[in-house]
Amino acid sequence: MTNPVVAIVGRPNVGKSTIFNRIVGERISIVEDVPGVTRDRIYSSAEWLNHKFYLIDTGGIDIGDEPLLVQIRQQAEIAIDEADVIIFMVNGRDGVTAADEEVAKILHRSNKPVVLAVNKIDNPEMRDLIYDFYALGFGDPYPISGSHGTGLGDLLDAVARHFPKRGQEEYEEDVIKFCLIGRPNVGKSSLVNAILGEERVIVSDIAGTTRDAVDTTFVREGQEYVIIDTAGMRKRGKIYESTEKYSVLRALKAIERSDVVLVVLNAEEGIIEQDKKIAGYAHEAGRGVIIVVNKWDAIEKDDKTLIEFERKIRDHFPFLDYAPIIFVSAKTKQRLHKLLPLVRMVSENHAMRVQTNVLNEVIMDAVAMNPTPTHNGRRLKIYYMTQVAVKPPTFVVFVNDPELMHFSYERFLENRIRDAFGFEGTPIKIIARPRK
């Protein structure tokens, strides 16, 4: 089950972005630790009392030169489409405006839970201003102050009460779940159709967090697979065309529910910055990754074309150096027969466990080959390493002082682990801890 989505909706200048930043806090910059990966500020992950959720700020959308009420209406409709819970924000100092009433009408039709937040109630004397807003028909309004941060706890408590209860896992453990992500026109839908071929497709309406997330289940060579959110690849209404950023949110939710992510590139168009961002989402999420170059039939080739394209990919995505690359054509079916075996291999690597004694033989050999670094006259000592998790494989290495573990030495250890055990297609995490 994915984390729920909360959208902040309201007319311009009611303080949506301020509240967004208040709720998100410091988390907005965390994602920028990954080299070459930046994230649009329109949405972020957030947490309140152990409830993790995505927060989207509809005010971050620029819908162009449309009249103001049309823009507000479009933003509200996008939020309704994507969100599990909606924070409807109004400005307490302005009273109820015609634009507020317009948004309220749309939200009433949505059947989504709505929590009404009255912003700019900056001191207790102003609380009486909230009573006019009962007329909007959303029950008790919550007084908040974006500038002071007051009232947010009560507001988030009310929001969290509407979160769906966490159920059991949607699919059996041995089912391989994968998704295809990529910018528009890279051929995701045609790839899905080519993978499925003429087989009878069992479309199961598994409730994701959106009403229209449809997963496609099929069996190939005795292995059950699920392509996550095939509906998301086909759904492109007018609003989505004008607000491309929202397809990112759908991709994030699909990634979260997948074991393996296929990052799809368009061979004809080459690699652009947006591809890098999209690939970064899969890497950050710790999923298995395969880079799929589609439309390979459409470009003129000589004996160097494939090698040069592969080098370009490695240059653009240094953080995905573990991901295999496959060149395919959904149209001519070129190399498509190799895709599912690759998905299966990466899924197995993503869930692989290594015995502690075998792992430590590799680590001790690595240290003998390349002694540990020193800092200010102190040398890093490695006592032992153990694997603590899978999906992705996560290792804890016990040392005398974690501060002495330089990232380049950590990288060296990761490469030795990969040389010994494979792990193609999956990120590896190494955490240095002091020995108690």
Curated annotation (Swiss-Prot):
KW Protease (keyword) present: no
Domain KH-like: 352-436
Alphabetical keyword list: GTP-binding, Nucleotide-binding, Repeat, Ribosome biogenesis
Acetylation in keyword set: no
PROSITE patterns in the cross-refs: G_ENGA
Residues annotated for GTP 1 binding in this entry: 10-17, 57-61, 119-122
One Pfam family of this chain: KH_dom-like
Gene3D superfamilies per the UniProt record, alphabetical: 3.30.300.20, P-loop containing nucleotide triphosphate hydrolases (3.40.50.300)
InterPro entries (UniProt xref): G_ENGA (IPR031166), GTP-bd (IPR006073), GTPase_Der (IPR016484), KH_dom-like (IPR032859), KH_dom-like_a/b (IPR015946), P-loop_NTPase (IPR027417), Small_GTP-bd (IPR005225)
Top-rank lineage group of the source organism: Bacteria
Subunit text: Associates with the 50S ribosomal subunit.
HAMAP family in the cross-refs: GTPase_Der (MF_00195)
NCBIfam families cross-referenced by the UniProt entry: GTPase_EngA, small_GTP
Function: GTPase that plays an essential role in the late steps of ribosome biogenesis.
Protein's name in the database: GTPase Der
Organism: Geobacillus sp. (strain WCH70)
Gene label: der
